[in-house]
Amino acid sequence: KLALWEPPYFLDPDARPPADQVQQYETMIAEGRRGDAAEYFMTKVVGMPPEFVADARTQPWWAGQEAIAHTLAYDARIMGDYLVPTETVAKVKVPTLVLAGGADMPFMRDTAQAIADALPEGEVRFLDGQGHNVDATVLAPALKEFFE
């Protein structure tokens, strides 16, 4: 069995991140602008409001975002065009649970549903009240139920 939490794809081709994002990340990292790279990801890729990111930069956890900012280019390369890879997904032959937060951005729930629909043995579950940073005490029971 397999479980996925909020697969980071898009259904709408117009919602995809900028095509030059790998170059943008690499330039920012080379220039020592790790925070800018993290901000670029949050605003240009995920679509978070700039005011959220401005506040995020003041939070204690922001240093962690900067520390891993160099990996954003790796992620962008792996993701390709960021559209749901339905042909690849359809080849997964194990029972798969696709989870998303019920309080998260709508595109995450839509994507989770689309992936579950494309899987031969897929099911989707939305965890009420949860955002992207899911509470482990909410996630664990859903996973336990599925894997038993």
Task: Name every feature range the model reports, one short phrase each.
Residues 1-29:
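Flexible "cap/lid" loop of the alpha/beta hydrolase fold
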Residues 34-40:
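Solenoid-repeat scaffolds in large eukaryotic assemblies
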Residues 45-62:
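Short, charge-rich amphipathic alpha-helical segments embedded
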Residues 60-84:
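Hydrophobic, aromatic-rich cap/lid helix
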Residues 84-93, 116:
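Serine-hydrolase catalytic core
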Residues 92, 98-100:
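Short beta-strand/loop motif that positions the catalytic acidic residue
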Residues 105-111:
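Conserved alpha/beta-hydrolase "acid-adjacent" motif
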Residues 120-148:
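Catalytic active-site module of serine/aspartate enzymes centered on a nucleophile-bearing elbow/loop
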